[in-house]
Each structure stands twice: as C-alpha cells, then as structure tokens.
Design a protein with these regions (language model features):
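Cleavable N-terminal export/targeting peptides
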Residues: 1-30, 252
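Short loop/turn motifs that connect adjacent beta-strands in outer-membrane beta-barrel proteins
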Residues: 20-33, 48, 67-86, 128-136, ...
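Residues that define the transmembrane beta-barrel architecture of outer-membrane proteins
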Residues: 32, 52-58, 84, 113-119, ...
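Transmembrane beta-strands of outer-membrane beta-barrel proteins
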Residues: 32-38, 58, 69, 86-90, ...
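Transmembrane beta-strand segments that form the barrel wall of outer-membrane beta-barrel proteins
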Residues: 36-44, 67-77, 104-108, 135-146
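Residues on the lipid-exposed face of transmembrane beta-strands in outer-membrane beta-barrel proteins
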Residues: 38-42, 58-64, 76-80, 121-125, ...
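Outer-membrane beta-barrel transmembrane domain signature
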Residues: 129, 146-228, 236-243, 249-250, ...
C-alpha cells in the first residue's frame, strides 16, 4: 500500500507540473461563480459510535470554468487543472478529537485522541454517459496527518453516478471505501494496555486495511431567484480492522448513518 501512496503523489506532482506549463487564463474575481450554503449535518460521534451528533453545515464553493475551491466536510479542497473531465488538487482536512465528551461511560475513561490537521490531495475523472448532464466520476483522495494524532494516512476511493433529472433537480449516487494504514487504524480502532485495564476488553492491535464500504445519495433542487435545497443521506458498514475492534464489538456498531439538509444561494 505504501507503493500506491507514492504512486498517487507522483501522479499529483507530475500532473500539477504539466498544468503549470500550460497557458493559463487571466485571473478576474468578477468572472467567478460563488455558491454558499448552510444547514445541519447528523453523523456518529466517532467512527463506530451508536450515538449521533448534530453539527452546523457551512459550505462555500467558488468556481471559474473548470477551476474551483470549496469546502468539503470539515476541510478545503481545490482543483488546479483546466480540464473538463480530469480534476486534481490539494486538500486540507480537520479531524476532531475523541475525548471525554462522548456519551459512552467506558470510552469516557479512555485516553483522549487529539484532533488533527491532515493534508493531501485528490484525483478524479468523469466520463459522460447517456444524456447531457449524466456522468460517472471516479475519485481517489489521500490524506496524511500533519501532527501526532495518529501519524498515519487514509485513502478514500469512490465512484459516483451523477444525473440531471430535470431543469431543477440533480442527483448523485456514490459508492465508496476507506483505507487506513496501521498507525491510523491502531489509533482509532486498537486497544492499548491502558485502555484494556480501564475497559476489561482484550488487547487489540489493528493492522492496515479497508475499514468500511458505503453508499450515499446527494440531491440538489433549484428554487427561484438563485436559491436551492440540498439533501444528503449516507450509510456505511465497518469492515476489516474496524469490524474486529473490541471498541466496535462491545460499545459501538458497524452500521453508520449520516444525513444532511441545507439551503444554498448562488451569486
């Protein structure tokens, strides 16, 4: 898997270099399109949790032609390629801590896992299929811990079917999976000697591997005067090292849901 990570980084670097060598359009803020949205996001308190939390959902996207910069969950990503199908660029992401604020009484006693800032990049490619506005997009995104929260990396792979249903409604259906290296998986799914004493659960050292497989549906509906509605519903099943974790087996669940609803405005 380390070879795959190196390959991804080489592709990102080489493609970025190629993009910089191509003639670029002049930069003009007035020609950028901006979308802002706000709403609520419901997700598990931590990976594998039975309990959920409700968070605000701010979103902003600025685009010009094929270029864009946008928020993506608790992070930021940008496309640096002037290409209609191929997208590539850097990403930053915040991962929240797992501390004593969780609802489970056993997990409250575990050592806190600090929050982290992660950096990496993504690469995606879209293939038009059928009617205009319909495409299939494959995407891979690698993120690395910049601090000492887990000192590891994750790789998200996904494939999305996008379709314009009518002049107001768009839908996206995504299948995805997440891979974590040993450092990442052992931090969030492993059980140390200290936590074994606290909980009475078995010691567990999680190895690298795929941790989940999931799907989501994203629907956008355009209203009048540049307003719109956004709805997202997702589900994933924990597998591999995550499934075998004593934390998931004893106080968590393999079934993870998320949902979001928001209102958007296009400038």
């Amino acid at each position: 898997m380390q070879s795959l990570v190196i390959f991804i980084l080489l592709v990102i670097f080489s493609t970025s270099t190629y993009a910089q060598q191509r003639p670029q359009e002049s930069f003009n803020l007035n020609s950028w399109n901006v979308i802002v949205a706000t709403g609520t996001f419901v997700s598990p308190q931590f990976e594998g949790s039975k309990h959920y939390r409700v968070l605000p959902l701010p979103f902003i996207r600025a685009s010009k032609g094929n270029y864009f910069i946008q928020t993506e969950g608790p992070g930021l990503t940008a496309n640096i390629l002037n290409h209609s199908r191929l997208k590539l660029g850097p990403s930053l992401q915040f991962r929240s801590e797992r501390d004593k604020d969780v609802k489970n009484s056993v997990l409250k006693k575990f050592k806190t896992i600090n929050s982290s800032i992660e950096a990496g990049g993504f690469l995606s490619y879209s293939i038009p299929v059928g009617a205009p506005g319909t495409n299939i997009t494959t995407k891979i995104k690698a993120m690395f811990d910049l601090g000492d929260a887990h000192n590891g990396y994750t790789i998200n792979s996904s494939i999305t079917f996008n379709k314009v249903l009518n002049r107001r409604t768009r839908i996206g259906i995504t299948l995805s999976t997440n891979f974590g290296d040993q450092n990442y998986n052992n931090t969030y799914y492993g059980l140390s000697a200290y936590n074994k004493i606290i909980s009475g659960y078995s010691l567990y050292e999680a190895g690298s591997g795929f941790n989940d497989i999931g799907s989501s549906v994203n629907v956008t509906y355009s209203l009048k005067n540049n307003w719109g509605l956004i709805g997202i519903f997702g589900y994933k099943k924990l597998i591999g090292p995550a499934k075998n974790s004593p934390i998931i087996k004893n106080i968590g669940t393999r079934n993870q849901f998320l949902s979001s609803i928001g209102v958007s405005y296009r400038f």
